[in-house]
Amino acid sequence: MSYGGGYGGGRGGGNGYGNGDSSYGRGNSYSNGYSNGGSNGYSGGGGGGYGGGRGGSGGGNVNGYSGGGGGYGGGGGYGGGGGAGGDRMNNLGANLQKQNWDLNTLPKFEKSFYKEDPVVAARSEEDVAKFRAQHNIAVQGPNIPKPVETFDEAGFPAYVMTEVKAQGFPAPTPIQSQGWPMALSGRDVVGIAETGSGKTLTYCLPAIVHINAQPLLAPGDGPIVLVLAPTRELAVQIQQEITKFGKSSRIRNTCVYGGVPKGGQIRDLAKGVEVCIATPGRLIDMIESGKTNLRRVTYLVLDEADRMLDMGFEPQIRKILGQIRPDRQTCMWSATWPKEVRALASDYLNDFIQVNIGSLELSANHRITQIVEVVSEFEKRDKMTKHLEKIMEDKDNKILIFTGTKRVADDITRFLRQDGWPALSIHGDKQQNERDWVLNEFKTGKSPIMVATDVASRGIDVRNITHVFNYDYPNNSEDYIHRIGRTGRAGQKGTAITLFTTDNQKQARDLVNVLTEAKQVIDPRLAEMTRFGGGGGGRGYGGRGYGGGRGRGGGGNFSSSNAAPLGGGRRW
């Protein structure tokens, strides 16, 4: 069957990351990426290294890392002045022109493509209810299409199905079974599903079909599909999926996020892209400076809407949505359904239909074994080491360690490396190219231990993480569920180990509720804590956070944590 084929072969090439210029920067600024001259690509005695021409004159190499003093960014530190920085929040969008939309004069567009397969149509309401119950699918709203049980029943055109089948998936995930017919029908959709449920493909494939039914982009046109995401990591992850499945249609995309130079992103937007995946701050920056516009957007996705609101992006999201025609199709995806997300949906989605996988109550993935140990603060490192010794007996294991602050993340990484463990850390003060490198080392298993702050608790999609270790308990149970959701994905089992102190006592009751719902064993000392209110105030460890401002040469950035030499007694 066909969905209209405006695109055919008439689309330019250059799809994917950066359209021809994905380098990390040139010349003195980054010393050709990772800086030549040192073993393992580290700065090794001169050159600008990452620090942007600040020196890097370290002494001899130790285990391939530059020794004494210089290290990765020399005395200036990795951040070289401001750290990686996220999207700028202050006054964003102040110069955006208010749009007055007259739907009578706007060009019409097609958004309804779903034609129910005869096999699906023949299923009784009883069969449909049984399928939904088996797969924990709950739906709300009028005239919701029946779920599909196979890829072929979804009725995607051949150019999409070829790519899907090449991935070797046996059948659609529950969110895809119900979400594809909903999204293809052109309706506004709210999807509530845990991380790792397959939601990215649930909106990506209908987006590709949508694009192929629209007129070709003209010079100066902005994107047709806009995907908003909370973090750079998630944005890049989404881009990889769209690149993979949009390849045969020659759909062009770009990823627009802060913390990296704008040049490549601006060039992509100027050439014309059908899909723009963006974090809110950098996108507003691009619109305000006239580098793109959202007049052609007819398919909008808000991914991890709850996380975007948690991170304070609501004013930016509302400004962006005001730049998009109101008769667009909007798909909103979220792991949870708090009142803030409900308010956003009711303000910006029209007559939406909703699909929910699992309970709307705060609940953890039941494939994850949750172990919570009540410890004192000074016991933590010893406990962590003992767990690592056991976990890393299996060389295929990958462990993600969460800390409450950037300082603790760097301290722990340095401690582990000096103890011989191949650990690297990632957090908001690391420059983007360091974060990319660390993530790649972790993904490929070269460094199977990654220490992270909550910047990585959502939006980093690394397959086969076998263990999550909460060195510090997060501020609330919702973040706890998001953190441990990095393991046990795509039908796999996982293990989450959490160190819980009296400082976290305020969170004990919520945590016990999560553990009870998932039928987990509860430490008697944790159960005891729930009898008392008050307690340590739930501040988490480390108080004020660390490192905002000037960068810290040799103190907590690449030169002293990720580039710390591995101790002599290698542990792995």
Swiss-Prot record:
Enumerate the UniProt keywords alphabetically: ATP-binding, Cytoplasm, Helicase, Hydrolase, Nonsense-mediated mRNA decay, Nucleotide-binding, Nucleus, Ribosome biogenesis, RNA-binding, rRNA processing
> Which reaction equation describes what this protein catalyses?
ATP + H2O = ADP + phosphate + H(+)
Q: What does the entry give for GO biological process?
A: alternative mRNA splicing, via spliceosome; nuclear-transcribed mRNA catabolic process, nonsense-mediated decay; rRNA processing
Task: Give the location of motif Q motif in residue numbers.
Answer: 149-177
* CDD domains tied to this protein: DEADc_DDX5_DDX17, SF2_C_DEAD
Q: Where is the Helicase C-terminal domain?
A: 383-530
Cellular component, GO annotation: cytoplasm; nucleus; ribonucleoprotein complex
Q: Give the Helicase ATP-binding domain ranges.
A: 180-355
Domain of life, per the record? Eukaryota
Q: What class of enzyme is it?
A: hydrolase
> Where is the sequence biased in composition, kind Gly residues?
547-557
The catalytic activity of this protein is classed by the Enzyme Commission as 3.6.4.13
Q: Which residues are involved in binding ATP?
A: A193, E194, T195, G196, S197, G198, K199, T200
Q: Where does this one sit in the cell?
A: Cytoplasm; Nucleus
Q: Quick one: where's region Disordered?
A: 547-572
List, alphabetically, the Gene3D superfamilies matched.
P-loop containing nucleotide triphosphate hydrolases
Q: Where does the motif DEAD box lie?
A: 303-306
InterPro entries under this entry?
DEAD/DEAH_box_helicase_dom (IPR011545), Helicase_ATP-bd (IPR014001), Helicase_C-like (IPR001650), P-loop_NTPase (IPR027417), RNA-helicase_DEAD-box_CS (IPR000629), RNA_helicase_DEAD_Q_motif (IPR014014)
Molecular function as annotated in GO: ATP binding; ATP hydrolysis activity; mRNA binding; RNA helicase activity
Major localization listed first in the record, in broad terms:
cytoplasm
* Assembly mode: Associates with polysomes.
What family, per the record?
Belongs to the DEAD box helicase family. DDX5/DBP2 subfamily.
Give the domain section of the comments: The Q motif is unique to and characteristic of the DEAD box family of RNA helicases and controls ATP binding and hydrolysis.
| Function according to Swiss-Prot or TrEMBL | ATP-dependent RNA helicase involved nonsense-mediated mRNA decay and ribosome biogenesis through rRNA processing.
Q: What is this protein called?
A: ATP-dependent RNA helicase dbp2
This protein's species is Sclerotinia sclerotiorum (strain ATCC 18683 / 1980 / Ss-1) (White mold)
Which gene name does the record give?
dbp2
